Amino acid sequence: MLDVALELDDAGRLIYRDVTLSIPRQQGKSTLLLVLWVTRCLLWPDQRVVYTAQSGLDARKKWAGDWLPLLAASPFAGLMTVHRQSGHERVVWANGSRQSLVATTARAGHGDSLDLAVLDEAFAHPDGRIEQALRPAMMTRSQPQFWTVSTAGTPDSSPFLFDKVTRGREIAAAGVTEGVAYFEWAATDDADPGDPATWGSCMPALGITVTAATVQADFESMERHEFERAFLNLWTA
């Protein structure tokens, strides 16, 4: 999907300013986001990239526990300097680009200009205050993107994400090919949740990093609505 989300027009500018990704859990989302922000930092100089998740602590755990070890073992290690001080975590690249973490508050991103903002685990946010805080920081940048990424929640507890998904589906159905990009992997509402064919229809990592045996075991042990939300990316009550 990155080849579409990062598509350029004839002038070499990003076609999409807003990207929403709705996908089941454990389907490669974290790896995709790592590739996204590293690509953005290296493709152009002096980029300002921020990442946040359901909480500042969760964002730091993803950043320090998952992403930094992969980068340290990669060919990119010599191109970056990592700052780990709490509240000032960032990766600074040799070309002047910088990736950092932001708090999950209405003041997130204030005072900075941003090229890419990623709001992960958006189901945990009841409203759009983080987006409202970060969007203005993109106004003066030539190629800004705001990413909203998550597994489904419930309409009552995740109205911000539910609105994003609803509008994204409408935009996709209308055939819009600029401005907003919407990607969703989910089972249909009438699909049999225990059928391996249903799992294969919405779980891109099935058979790669996730086994059918694991999914079967979780299907048998979990509450049905929780399984449908986490594994099939279905909105449940």
Regions found by a protein language model. Give the residues of each.
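Phosphate/NTP-binding elements of NTP-utilizing enzymes
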Residues: 1-237
